[in-house]
UniProtKB/Swiss-Prot annotation:
UniProt superkingdom: Eukaryota
CDD domains (alphabetical): Bbox1_ZFYVE1_rpt1, Bbox1_ZFYVE1_rpt2, FYVE_ZFYV1, GBP
Main location: Golgi
Subunit: Interacts with RAB18 (in GTP-bound form). Interacts with BSCL2 in a RAB18-dependent manner. Interacts with ZW10.
Name of this chain's protein: Zinc finger FYVE domain-containing protein 1
Pfam families given in the database record: ANCHR-like_BBOX, FYVE
Organism field: Pongo abelii (Sumatran orangutan)
Example of a GO MF term: 1-phosphatidylinositol binding
Length: 789
């Protein structure tokens, strides 16, 4: 801490002498002040004293011109806060303490202490010094805000415009470990919200855009970082503006309010309107009802080390008038905050979510507006960490991201309530039961967390949706509710044995706890209805996107077809290699001489697509090269190659050059005549067999359609894969997911698992999405007792 005193430092405080006299006689000029030694010290005394081990860590400061120390007796009352501790006016030479005027009167006004010698400090020099320091501090603050710029945080469609935490911190231009608070502003459009923020936080610089035109210059939510107060300042779009998507933009305001520590409501009206109180009251109610729970969930889900207080932000109502008096001016005995609470109570609004509500008014006789009172009130609230403590910018971004993910999406106009600024429709799920029309009571996007739809009332039965669910009666009487479905066979039966039992004794109802509780044809006669004996019926809601409940899960016919297809496919796959080899060899033997052999054709001659083992290679009758089906789908006569006047397959290039005749000699035609005859005979046989196969495929398709389970999408309605959107063709086969019934390609549905809720107790084909879900989701969706399917 010690250093050599420069000649310039000598004479700065000629009236302040060393108060220690430890290494000097007390005649040396004081250079340092030690707050813990409670004395002014010269250079030598400061060095000698603080060489001692117990005094080494004392906090010392170098004196400035006109320095006056703090009162030592005030130190214990208010700590080290400047502006609270009083400056000393004298120093008692006997007690060796500095005293302010009040402490001197209290401790040295009577007794022997009245005679203690004192040294008087020059307070007039102190005042000039403090004013100079204040001016220097103001200049420093203005310089700190010179490079501050605002950025669009959320647009008018509730889309966050920063990609991640790092991008948010980079645009704020603050350190990642910087602790900061959030201050936002609300109010009607045109009341000067952006102008207020510019003058309150940024000394009049236009950080947030302002405009004298009628159009609103603030669209969406903009943010900037105030390095002086260490606060993220957020500017919002005005209320009562001529905008589209009004409901979504109003909901966006509450998201900003939820992440704020301090809220300014700016009003330029001569009298406080009811809209102000309704907005704050409705915002408080919606905050407690919808956002408190989500903020708690965000804390747990994101592992945030700083708790997001369930108590909302502090509110300052900044009221600027021109022609009328400020609130409370005609009632000096009542504070404005008391009058504010009375207005809330009269309107039936109770702003319980806010930690405090303050009123700060200013009357502007002549512009510009005085923002000094608002600035002082803001600084006091920002220093108060009792309710909301500063946090890292990453925590702020996570909270905003969580609220945006949860409360997003369009708000239907027919569901919107106009009696409140923040109706429940802004935050609750918009799904309606298809049977009874009751809405879901959960928050928006609850399906992302696996939470099913729920309603406040019970549903009614609809024959159209058959919204019944069977539960095991024995388990229900034992205190457990277990859903069951009719199906072809029991889970303990093998596929073929299950089909045999189904043919003999009908469908079964199986409970996971009780086993098989019912068979439809267990006896020759006298079989009772399961509802009367082993199951109970429950009527459940029908939510959009969910399948039926007691739809026919008897899949015996489809299981039989699957078994036959499996055997046929196994034989086909085993014989595919030898069959293709023999076919290629036989084709080469009867091919014309100018055709390229199949063994040399590895890819399409035009599009260069590589041929797989089961792909068909086509020869152009004009040039003889190998092509895929799409590059050789055109036909035209090729008489120059001996194919006569009938149209035959040619590639796209030869079709476009059909007017150019190939120069072939008569000798070539004669040489190719024999092979052409053999090839024509081979094609005639192939076409005949193809027609027979097509004739067989038509009734086979009818059989498959008849065997299709009720929840499967019909084949003729499936045009492309439900997952990758590839269009189905001759080469791309359709496959049904046994869980959801949608159509998929083989790549998107190659997983295998049991689907007991659909009657498939053994591993069967399912799509990627259904394979990720728990095994019991299909039924839990119906009853509302599990995650969303």
């Amino acid at each position: 801490m010690s250093a050599q005193t420069s000649p310039a430092e000598k004479g700065l405080n000629p009236g302040l002498m060393c108060q220690e006299s430890y290494a000097c006689s007390g005649t040396d000029e004081a250079i340092f002040e030690c707050d813990e030694c409670c004395s002014l010290q010269c250079l030598r005394c400061e060095e000698e004293l603080h060489r001692q081990e117990r005094l080494r860590n004392h906090e010392r400061i170098r004196l400035k011109p006109g320095h006056v120390p703090y009162c030592d007796l005030c130190k214990g009352l208010s700590g080290h806060l400047p502006g609270v501790r009083q400056r000393a006016i004298v120093r008692c030479q006997t007690c060796k303490i500095n005293l302010c005027l009040e402490c001197q009167k209290r401790t040295h006004s009577g007794g022997n202490k009245r005679r203690h010698p004192v040294t008087v400090y020059n307070v007039s020099n102190l005042q000039e010094s403090l004013e100079a320091e204040e001016m220097d501090e103001e200049t420093k603050r203005k310089k700190m805000t010179e490079k501050v710029v605002s950025f669009l945080l959320v647009d008018e469609n509730e889309e966050i415009q920063v990609t991640n935490e790092e991008d948010f911190i980079r645009k704020l231009d603050c350190k990642p470990d910087q602790h900061l608070k959030v201050a936002s502003i609300f109010g009607n459009t045109g009341d000067g919200k952006s102008h207020t923020l510019n003058h309150t936080f940024f000394y009049g610089r236009e950080v947030f855009k302002t405009s004298p035109t009628q159009e609103s210059c603030t669209v969406g939510v903009w943010a900037a970082y105030d390095p002086v107060h260490k606060v993220a300042v957020i500017d919002t779009e005005g209320l009562l503006g001529a905008t589209v998507n009004l409901s979504q933009r109003t909901r966006l305001l509450l998201k900003v309010l939820a992440i704020s520590d301090l809220v300014i409501y700016r009003t330029h009206a001569d009298r406080l309107h009811n809209d102000l109180f309704k907005f704050l009251g409705d915002a408080s109610e919606a905050y407690l009802k919808h956002y408190t729970k989500e903020l708690k969930a965000t804390t747990a889900r994101c592992g945030l080390d700083v708790p997001l207080s369930t108590l909302g932000p502090a509110v300052i109502i900044f009221h600027e008038t021109v022609h009328t008096q400020l609130l409370g001016s005609d009632h000096p005995s009542e504070v404005p905050e008391k009058l504010i609470q009375d207005r809330f109570r009269k309107l039936g609004r109770f702003p319980e979510a806010f930690s405090s509500i303050h009123y700060k008014g200013t009357r502007t006789y002549n512009p510009p507006t005085d923002f000094s009172g608002l600035r002082r009130a803001l600084e006091q609230l920002l220093e108060n960490n009792t309710t909301r403590s500063p946090r890292h910018p990453g925590v702020i971004f996570k909270a905003l991201k969580a609220l945006s993910d949860r409360f997003s999406g369009e708000i239907p106009d027919d569901q919107m309530a106009h009696s409140s600024f923040f109706p429940d429709e802004y935050f609750t799920c918009s799904s309606l039961c298809l049977s009874c029309g009751v809405g879901c009571k959960n928050s928006m996007n609850h399906g992302k967390e696996g939470v099913p739809h729920e309603a406040k009332s019970r549903c009614r039965y609809s024959h159209q949706y058959d919204n019944r669910v069977y539960t095991c009666k024995a388990c229900y009487e034992g205190g457990e509710e277990v859903s069951v479905v009719p199906k072809t066979s029991a889970s303990t039966d093998s596929p073929w044995m299950g089909l045999a039992k189904y043919a003999w004794s009908g469908y079964v109802i199986e409970c996971p706890n009780c086993g098989v509780v019912y068979r439809s044809r267990q006896y020759w006669f006298g079989n009772q209805d399961p509802v009367d004996t082993v199951v109970r019926t429950e009527i459940v809601h029908v939510w959009p996107g969910t399948d039926g409940f007691l739809k026919d899960n008897n899949n015996a016919a489809q299981r039989l077809l699957d078994g036959m297809n499996f055997m046929a496919q196994s034989v086909s796959e085993l014989s595919l290699g030898p069959t293709k080899a023999v076919t290629s060899w036989l084709t080469d033997q009867i091919a014309p001489a100018y055709w390229r052999p199949n063994s040399q054709i590895l890819s399409c001659n035009k599009c260069a697509t590589s041929f797989k083992d089961n792909d068909t290679k086509h020869h152009c009758r004009a040039c003889g090269e190998g092509f895929c089906d799409s590059c050789s789908s055109k036909t035209r006569p090729v008489p120059e190659r001996g194919w006569g006047p009938a149209p035959v397959r040619v590639c796209d290039n030869c079709y476009e050059a059909r007017n150019v005749q190939l120069a072939v000699t008569e000798a070539q035609v004669d040489d190719e005549g024999g092979t052409l005859i053999a090839r024509k005979v081979g094609e005639a046989v192939q076409n005949t067999l193809g027609a027979v196969v097509t004739a067989i495929d038509i009734p086979l398709g009818l059989v498959k359609d008849a065997a299709r389970p009720a929840y499967w999408v019909p084949d003729h309605e499936i045009l492309h894969c439900h997952n990758c959107r590839k269009e189905f063709s001759i080469k791309l086969s359709k496959h049904h997911c046994r869980a959801c019934g949608q159509g998929f390609c083989d790549e998107c549905s190659h997983d295998r698992r049991a689907v007991p809720s659909r009657g498939w107790d053994h591993p069967v084909r399912v799509c990627f999405n259904c394979n990720k879900k728990p095994a019991w989701t299909s039924l839990s969706v119906m009853t509302g007792k599990g995650p969303l399917c």
